[in-house]
Amino acid sequence: MKLSQIKALLKTVDRVSFKLPNGELVPAHFHVTEVGKITKNFIDCGGTIRNEALVGFQLWTANDTEHSLKPQKLIDIIELSEEKLQIEDHEVEVEYQGTTIGKYGIGFDGTHFLLLNKQTDCLAKDNCGIPIEKQKVQLVDISSSGNTCTPGGGCC
């Protein structure tokens, strides 16, 4: 989800809440301790130079259980970051401390912002010898698709 989408959604909710991939909610007294620009410049295993840009949020939970981040306060933090750091409208990545620091994509279910698991992937499969996964088709599906040859149909 892009930063502009998060800002628009924040204007529609009464409270900010995040749900972990396992369904648990991040404690309501969380803090957003960072909003920043993340850049990653690297060479993939195929030798291609790549540049990525993300917006990073860091969530942190302290023992101040009376704290509650209001949607407008988060919008204010985001807008200050956009102004001072020249943050553009990139995808947002959220860091949250579990057993280690987890990095998540973000979604929204109408009530909660969803922390979505991220996956690693090879960016140069064509250069690494990784076979391209072929689409599996069952024979029964082929014959029922209507793309069969008939005598006089001109397909042969």
Q: Residue ranges of each PLM-predicted region?
A:
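Charged, amphipathic alpha-helical segments and their flanking helix caps
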Residues: 2-4, 64-87
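Beta-strand secondary-structure signal
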Residues: 17, 56-58, 93
